[in-house]
Amino acid sequence: KDVKMRTFITQDNERDDLVAHVYDITYGTIRAGVDNLVIIDDSIVRGTTLRQSIIRILDRLKPKKIVVCSSAPQIRYPDCYGIDMSRLSDFVAFRAVIELLRERGMEHVIEDVYRKAVAELQKGDRSETVNCVTEIYDRFTDEEISAKIAEIVTAPEIQARVEVIYQ
């Protein structure tokens, strides 16, 4: 794809407009309310393109269910597969575990992990640094996180049930 059409590498202020105009579908390819629609995504990082464009477009076909299969595992941390983003909150997997923690009354875990991460940064020897954020993910199964990601990438007006499956 031309770099101007790559929604992932587009600047933040231009991404929302671009994702609404890059993709389209072939109508009449499935039986409305009967067929499930399976798509493959190379990776789900922010979830923006899925939520604001792809799932909306696919929902126009009125499938019974949309299954999004990611050929990559859940992208949970910066600098994974060359993805270098500075804010954990940009990652849909991170937003999913934060929502799960809040839903289950476990907000204290967020503060505990934050304190541990700050303490790690203050250590003199960075060669022994521990990624404390893993503790946030460890409280949930991959399936629980994937189910929450499916909720996040599904806009309220979507009629089809959406499921997200990772490699």
Map each language-model feature to its residues.
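PRPP-associated nucleotide enzymes
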Residues: 1-167
